[in-house]
Structures are given as structure tokens and as C-alpha cells.
A protein has these predicted regions:
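Disordered, low-complexity tails and leader-like regions
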Residues: 2-3, 74, 567-569
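Bacterial N-terminal signal peptides that target proteins for export
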Residues: 1-10
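Poly-acidic low-complexity segments
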Residues: 2, 87-88, 93, 165-168, ...
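Serine-hydrolase catalytic core recognition
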Residues: 470, 477-771
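Beta-propeller folds
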Residues: 12, 22-469, 475-476, 487-488, ...
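N-terminal signal peptide c-region/cleavage motif recognized by signal peptidases
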Residues: 16-18
Length: 771
């Protein structure tokens, strides 16, 4: 069935009930083909805001002329009458906040190590090579800077003007036999005085040689990959991670449209259940020229099994873990490290004595669902908030200990031994995002949803007094980049119906913004975009559920409604700023113009509402999250909507929920549209799925009750499925397998629309329009 006809049928069913379908006229001034062009219709907004080294310019990526891609623009806030202009790539020197305490800044530019003197504004090229230079690290000695070439560390000393190689990590096992260890060589030495005399003279000469420089001893890493190579600020230690990655079976994505006229395959991610990698944390003592590996077998409950296994006996071996990069103490031979278990149940923060390798466990976070939350991260390999205050005695990190993600402080050397070492720095039923320290170390700068769970305030927090100063806390999202002197804010701001624009403000409490960019097009500005109301309704378990509500004027209301389901699961969309689902936002305005009510729900598993909200789908996706949509349907009925005229649609996780609504609760919705949907979680990726459903071989029931394909026989309402054929995330195989089930079950009230050139995130406006 053609898609436009199917859409017309769905609209007609919602408007007039299940009689013969007919074309539904569009009563809106919005044209679907135009709004599906996305930012070409809206206007391309500024992004990637950053400052120049000298703090005089704000750089940002922008495309005001609707070119094929973004270009770098600059704006000088101190220059009266200044307007954004296109930057000369040769003159761009970006500020690096990690080097803010130094009088100079080093960068890798075009394969060269460069230095910028902040006092004289002089720019110098230090070292050029065809080798790959990367990963600049600063030393306690301001004249020394470390950088990597390949897998090894080098040091540049500005005072001496030299570059020294500090490490020599090599693949393989090294030479297994010494050059003098063969039988024949031993025999020669044993039989002939001439050979013995030669060896003696050679040894004597070597003993008299004066070595001006220490040789760099090779360290062989075997078949492992070496990662996260770091130098301690005092230069005494180098840390690194050796990783053994299993050869997991990759999936294939077939491409049917190509320039040569032939199909071809590309590799894609493995499926859930793959073998976990093995990691080791190594420490190289530069003075002793020795390497040891930190023994993590003493981590609390390292062999404990999760509760879902119903087995109280510990594992016979340690659980596999992944360690993040070290955060070195600048005044001692200590470092803190964030370690995660690969089964997603535990997080340990340890304080390591770099001399001995002994460690103290300063924080252990355990969650029988999975570790996650803002500043913590539910992805094992993604780093969370962790660092040292300027006193070099206090570690800061984030934890969901109270049910919401907040900042905590740990005293490594408390003045009073009986004092509680770990204390909460912030608290409340709201969450912290994007933590950074001020240059003087006296303040935290953070984003938070303190004023409203749908806002992102920009707050300044005094560490000594724990006072909170709202810098930007009005409705919307304040994405702030601080100038090098921290006196000026470059702000990327949006609200519910106003896309992102660049503003500036003075760094004071409740500052006033000055707008710099005007990005939206005449076509976008010609329409009066609604500000959807952010509301709450009660879930059937008594909990508040947040949602965006779009309502037509009473005279236009047709008592039919559409429920939109956002993707990702852990994502917030019922907020007070510009949505990542901007096409859907515009589509919802079009629907409201046509008399529909639209409800966009932040169902259980969504971001911004704390730990219990985040983990409510553990071991059952399509359970509590789907129930929130059924409760949302009841809420719509309370507004006068006909319960038989409510449709549901969404993409990715939203498509999955749509399928579960149509298949596991048949009869609840007369029609649904499922876009790029997961149909069987055993076929999705490992990192995301294992957090929530564990592993298919250890928790098969969680996978069965969470996968729409097992409920295919229940289909009653009208269903359309839409999927990109080169989707390397939720792969095309998902919708093909469910289609085969429908065919075998003799289901007829479904349609499949495929998009041959589209991946998970559609790129072409004609595909969006057709979808």
C-alpha cells in the first residue's frame, strides 16, 4: 500500500472511525514536504561554541548560507558593533581549558607540535613530523610538555630545547634468546682462550663507557592493544591499559544502491552476548625502569553474582572490569581511577599508591539494575565526573546514592581522623550535568535541572561555603562556554519553540543575555510555533510522569489524538528547550492545526528524573515504559479524547514501544507507525542491551518478554513499519524477521515501507517526507 494512502487511512480512522478511508485535507499552513527538510527549512543553528586562546574571540560552527556543511565563524564580544564573520582557518587558535593555569598553551596543529605564549601572543612551531602526534599532557614543570607519537610518550623541554623519548612500547614478545645463549657460542667460549680474552676486553671497554643518557628500555605488550597512555605530572610514572579484545562475530549491512551498480556489504557491530574484553592496568616506574600491573582482585565483591541469577555462590574467577584513565594528584605519587564491572552492576573508585600499586577503595557504587546516570554514564567505557580539587586532598565525583545524580567529595587526608571522609556536596530531587572547576579551584560550574526538571540551568557553586549562585536559570537550556578569564559567557541557548542561538553575558548571578546570531529562515519565522505545555499525569503506580501536551483550540478539536514515543530510552524530550526531534515538533504543530491533540511522554527510562525512573525497565522493556503510554492514553481520555481514536508512533526505541503497544496490548490503539524499530533485543548491540536485560544466555526470559516478535500473533490494529535498509544500528534484519512472522501468521493489516539509502538517522529530506 502506498505510504500516503496508509497515512490518510490512519488519520481518517482517528477522525471518523473505521469506515471506508478517504483522503484527508491538510488544514495547516505548514507543508509536510517543507518541514521535513529539517534545518534547511528551520535554519542551521550555531554549535560547538569555544573561545580563542587570548579570550578575544568566540568561535562556533555555523551554516547561515545553507551550504553543504558548517564552517567556523568568529565573534568579538568586546568590539562594539561586532558581527559574526567567517574565520580564516589559518588564524584559529582555540583555548584549551586543561592548560588554563600555564602561561603558554601547546597544541598539535597539522601534524606539528606548537606553542602559544599567552603573554607575548607569539606562536611557535616546535616539532614537525609525518608521524601521528597526539595527546598533549602538561607537567608540574611549566617548561616541560608531554605528547604521544604512535604508542609512545615523548617530552619536550623548552629550557633545554630538546625532545626525549620516554617509553618504548612494542608489540610482540621480544627476543626469546640472548645472542650468547646458543650451544655453539657457549662451546667456543669454553674451548678457546682467544674468545675468552676477546669477551673480557669487550666487557672492560663497556665498563669504562660514560653514559650521558638513560637508554629507553623496550617493553613488549604481546598481542594486546595499548591504550590510555598517561604521564604523571611529576614525570615519575607512566600509566597504561593493556586490552585483549575478543574476535566477536560482526554483522553485515547490505547496500543495494551504489555508484557501480553492484550490491556490496559493510561490517557493523556485533550482537548482544559477545565475549567481554580483558584489561590490565599497568604502571611504569620511570626512575626504576620497572613495570607492574595493579592487582584488582581485592575489589569489594569482585566475584559476587547478580541477584537475577538466584545463585548465592560466588564466581570462581574475578568478574571482568574496565578501568578508565587515571586522575593524577599533582603533589603526590597518587592517582584515582574509575573502574566498572562489565556486567554493569558495580563501579569502584580507587586511590592508587603509584609506588607500590596498593590501592584504597574510596567509593563503591552497586546497582542490581545497572550503573548509570548523569556524570556517571551507563556506558562502561565512557568516563564520568572524577577529579581532584586544588587542595590535592579532595576527590570529587558523582553518585546516584540518594536517587538523583549529585556531586560528592572524598577527603583523602582528613584533619580529624574520625570525620566522615565522603560527603554530599549537592542534594535534592534534581540532577547535575557537565561539572567543571573554575581556574582558581574555588567554584564548580555545572548544568542542572534544579529550577525545573525540564530546564538546564547554569550554576556557580562555591566549594568552601557550598553556596549555589544561579547564573542562568530561566526557562530553557543554557549551554555555556566560559572565556579564559571566566568573566564572559558564550551561551548556546534555546527554549521550547525557539531553536539554538548564540548569546553572550557577563559572568554574574542572574545575568542578562545578549543575542549574537539570527539563524532561522523567513519560512520558519512566518509560522507561529506553539509552546507545548510541559505537564505531569499520574502513572498507574502513583508516580508523576512528565509529558509535552499539544492541544488545538476547542473549535478545531476533533477528539482524536496521537501519542509520540521518543527514541533512545534514556533521553529527555518533555523539556523546555529545542528538541532533537525538531521535525516531529513541526509535524505535531501540523497535526494540531488539523484538530489532533498530541501527547509526547517522557516515559519510564527517560533521562532527567533520577535513578528509579532510569532503571524502571530493568529486565522488562515494554513493561513499565509501555504502561506509562497506556496511562497517557487514559489522561487524554480525561481531556475529552475518544479512547478509540488515539494512535501511536515513534522511531528506534519509540518504534519498539509502538510495536509493543500494538502487539502486547492488542486493541488499545487502532493504528500505529513503528519507525526503525527493535523487534528482537537478542539482535541488538551489546553495550546498550546488556545493561537492561543482562545476557540472552543467562536471562532469556527478560529477552522474550521484552521482544515484540514474540507477540506477533496478537496484531489487531493497523500497523505500518518503516525502516532504512542500510541501518547499521537497528539493522534491517529486525523488521525483516518480524515481517516473516506476520506472513507465517497470516496477518494482513500491516505494511512495510523500506528506504534503500537510509541508515538509522535519515539524511535525505525526500526520505523524511515519504516516511
Amino acid at each position: 500500500m502506498p505510504l500516503n494512502r496508509f497515512f490518510s487511512q490512519c488519520c481518517f480512522f482517528l477522525i471518523a472511525g473505521f469506515s471506508a478511508a478517504q483522503s484527508v485535507p491538510n488544514s495547516s499552513s505548514l507543508v509536510l514536504e517543507e518541514i521535513m527538510k529539517g534545518n534547511e527549512f528551520i535554519g542551521h543553528q550555531p554549535e560547538n561554541i569555544r573561545w580563542s586562546i587570548d579570550g578575544k574571540k568566540i568561535y562556533f560552527d555555523w551554516n547561515p548560507k545553507n551550504e553543504p556543511g558548517n564552517s567556523t565563524y568568529e565573534f568579538e564580544p568586546a568590539l562594539k558593533g561586532s558581527k559574526p564573520i567567517l574565520s580564516d582557518p589559518k588564524t584559529i587558535l582555540e583555548y584549551d581549558q586543561t592548560q588554563s593555569s600555564y602561561s603558554d598553551q601547546y597544541q598539535i596543529i597539522g601534524g606539528s607540535l606548537t606553542r602559544y605564549d599567552k603573554n607575548s601572543n607569539q606562536f611557535t612551531r616546535i616539532y614537525s613530523t609525518t608521524s601521528d602526534l597526539h595527546s598533549i599532557q602538561r607537567s608540574n614543570d611549566p617548561k616541560t610538555v608531554y605528547f604521544q607519537s604512535g604508542s609512545n610518550i615523548f617530552a619536550y623541554n623548552r629550557g633545554l630545547g630538546n625532545i626525549l623519548q620516554l617509553t618504548d612500547f612494542r608489540s610482540g614478545e621480544g627476543s626469546e634468546k640472548k645472542s650468547d645463549s646458543t650451544y655453539l657460542m657457549k662451546q667456543q667460549t669454553e674451548l678457546f682462550e682467544f674468545i675468552r680474552d676477546q669477551n673480557e676486553r669487550t666487557a672492560w671497554r663497556k665498563s669504562k663507557e660514560i653514559k650521558l643518557f638513560r637508554d629507553v628500555t623496550p617493553f613488549y605488550i604481546g598481542k594486546d592493544q595499548i591504550e590510555q597512555i598517561q604521564v604523571s605530572p611529576n614525570g615519575r610514572f607512566v600509566s597504561f591499559r593493556l586490552s585483549d579484545y575478543p574476535n566477536s562475530a560482526e554483522t553485515k549491512v547490505e547496500h543495494h544502491i551504489s555508484s557501480k551498480g553492484y550490491t556490496y556489504s559493510s561490517n557493523a557491530r556485533a550482537k548482544v552476548g559477545e565475549e567481554e574484553p580483558t584489561h590490565r592496568l599497568g604502571i611504569l616506574n620511570m626512575e626504576k625502569d620497572t613495570v607492574y600491573f595493579v592487582d584488582l582482585s581485592k575489589l569489594t565483591d569482585i566475584r559476587k553474582k547478580p541477584e537475577y541469577l538466584n545463585d548465592t555462590l560466588p564466581y570462581s574467577n574475578d568478574r571482568k572490569v574496565v578501568m578508565h584513565s587515571l586522575k593524577f594528584n599533582k603533589s603526590s605519587d597518587q592517582a584515582v581511577c574509575d573502574i566498572r564491572s562489565y556486567d554493569n552492576k558495580d563501579r569502584w573508585i580507587i586511590l592508587i599508591d603509584l609506588i607500590t600499586g596498593n590501592f584504597t577503595e574510596i567509593e563503591r557504587q552497586h546497582d542490581e539494575a545497572w550503573i548509570g546516570g548523569p556524570g556517571i554514564s551507563g556506558w562502561n567505557t565512557e568516563e564520568g565526573t572524577l577529579g581532584w580539587l586544588n587542595d590535592n586532598q579532595t576527590v570529587y565525583f558523582q553518585s546516584e546514592k540518594t536517587g538523583y545524580s549529585h556531586i560528592y567529595l572524598y577527603q583523602t587526608s582528613p584533619l580529624i581522623k574520625t570525620i566522615q571522609r565522603t560527603t554530599a556536596f549537592t542534594e535534592g530531587s534534581w540532577e547535575i550535568y557537565n561539572v567543571s572547576l573554575s581556574k582558581d579551584g574555588k567554584y564548580f560550574y555545572v548544568n542542572a535541572n534544579r529550577s525545573h526538571l525540564g530546564n538546564r540551568d547554569f550554576l556557580k557553586m562555591e566549594i568552601a561555603s557550598r553556596k549555589i549562585f544561579p547564573v542562568m536559570s530561566n526557562e530553557g537550556y543554557h549551554d555555556v562556554s566560559l572565556s579564559p578569564d571566566e568573566k564572559t559567557l558564550a551561551i548556546r541557548f534555546s527554549d521550547k519553540n525557539t531553536p539554538w542561538e548564540l548569546y553572550t553575558a557577563v559572568n554574574t548571578a542572574n545575568a542578562t543575555k545578549t543575542r549574537i546570531t539570527y539563524s532561522t529562515t523567513k519560512q520558519f519565522n512566518a509560522y507561529q510555533w506553539r509552546k507545548p505545555e510541559v505537564i505531569t499525569f499520574k502513572g498507574s503506580d502513583g508516580k508523576d510522569v512528565y509529558a509535552r501536551l499539544y492541544q488545538p483550540q476547542i473549535a478545531q478539536k476533533n477528539t482524536a489524538a496521537v501519542i509520540f514515543v521518543h527514541g533512545a530510552g534514556y533521553l529527555q524530550n518533555a523539556h523546555n528547550y529545542w528538541s532533537n526531534y525538531y521535525r516531529e515538533f513541526m509535524f505535531h504543530n501540523l497535526l494540531v492545526d488539523n484538530g489532533f491533540t498530541v501527547l509526547d511522554i517522557d516515559y519510564r527510562a527517560s533521562e532527567g528524573y533520577g535513578r528509579d525512573y532510569r532503571t524502571a525497565i530493568y529486565r522488562h522493556m515494554g513493561g513499565r515504559d509501555l504502561q506509562d503510554h497506556l496511562d497517557g492514553k487514559d489522561y487524554l481520555v480525561s481531556l475529552g479524547i475518544d479512547s478509540n481514536r488515539i494512535g501511536i508512533y515513534g522511531g528506534s526505541y519509540g518504534g519498539f514501544i509502538t510495536l509493543m503497544a500494538m502487539l502486547s496490548t492488542p486493541g488499545e490503539f487502532p493504528c500505529g507507525a513503528a519507525l526503525r524499530s527493535v523487534t528482537d533485543w537478542a539482535h541488538y548491540n551489546h553495550e546498550y542491551t546488556s545493561n537492561i536485560l543482562n545476557y540472552p544466555d543467562t536471562d532469556p526470559e527478560a529477552y522474550r518478554k521484552s521482544s515484540p516478535i514474540y507477540f506477533a500473533d496478537n496484531l489487531q490494529g493497523k500497523l505500518v513499519m518503516l525502516h532504512g535498509m542500510v541501518d547499521d544500528n537497528v539493522q534491517f534484519q529486525d523488521v525483516v524477521r518480524l515481517s516473516q512472522r506476520f506472513i507465517e501468521l497470516h496477518k494482513t493489516n500491516w505494511d512495510l515501507a523500506v528506504f534503500p539509502v537510509e541508515a538509522h538517522g535519515f539524511r535525505e529530506s525526500y526520505s523524511w517526507n515519504d516516511e
